[in-house]
Amino acid sequence: FTQRRMKLGFTQADVGLALGTLYGNVFSQTTICRFEALQLSFKNMCKLKPLLNKWLEEADSSTGSPTSIDKIAAQGRKRKKRTSIEVSVKGALESHFLKCPKPSAQEITNLADSLQLEKEVVRVWFCNNLQ
């Protein structure tokens, strides 16, 4: 299965997402990985094998022409582009961190507004700097 999947150019995450879209059962990348490594229970392997065989047949038969499987893979979870923080903004975050390394949600919101950053970016910055 693994070799055929890779030859077709699909990731484990693509397969899990496609199974959900095509057959109604979404499987995580971890589950597909464990299937390939034969690390699932016998019962779960038996449940997953027919779905994966069906998916492989459809993927094999559609090579060369864009299909629903290709479209599903294309709309897979997109990662957010890495955030780059300007030097002046980083300085402001660092000075606030020295005063208060664990700001409240309200403080994070206020700081994000004042620095014109997304609240999530500020929250993650503080989490990363605690480590």
UniProtKB/Swiss-Prot annotation:
Q: Which Gene3D superfamilies match?
A: Homeodomain-like (1.10.10.60), lambda repressor-like DNA-binding domains (1.10.260.40)
Q: Which UniProt keywords apply?
A: Developmental protein, DNA-binding, Homeobox, Neurogenesis, Nucleus, Transcription, Transcription regulation
Q: Name one GO biological process term.
A: metanephric DCT cell differentiation
> Domain named POU-specific: which ranges?
1-60
Q: Which InterPro entries match?
A: HD (IPR001356), Homeodomain-like_sf (IPR009057), Lambda_DNA-bd_dom_sf (IPR010982), POU (IPR013847), POU_dom (IPR000327), POU_domain_TF (IPR050255)
Q: Does the keyword Isomerase apply?
A: no
Look up keyword RNA-binding and say if it applies.
no
Task: List the stretches of this chain annotated as a DNA-binding region.
Answer: 78-131
The record's section on SMART domains has:
HOX, POU
The superkingdom of the source organism is Eukaryota
Q: In which tissues is it expressed?
A: Brain.
Give compartment(s).
Nucleus
Q: Which GO terms describe its molecular function?
A: DNA-binding transcription factor activity; protein homodimerization activity; sequence-specific DNA binding
Q: Kindly indicate where the leader peptide sits in this chain.
A: none
Q: Which GO terms describe its cellular component?
A: nucleus
**Alphabetical list of PROSITE patterns matching this protein:** HOMEOBOX_2 (PS50071), POU_1 (PS00035), POU_2 (PS00465), POU_3 (PS51179)
The protein's assembly and partners: Homodimer.
UniProt function note: Transcription factor that acts synergistically with SOX11 and SOX4. Plays a role in neuronal development. Is implicated in an enhancer activity at the embryonic met-mesencephalic junction; the enhancer element contains the octamer motif (5'-ATTTGCAT-3').
Record-stated family: Belongs to the POU transcription factor family. Class-3 subfamily.
The name on file for this protein is POU domain, class 3, transcription factor 3
Q: Say which species the protein is native to.
A: Sus scrofa (Pig)
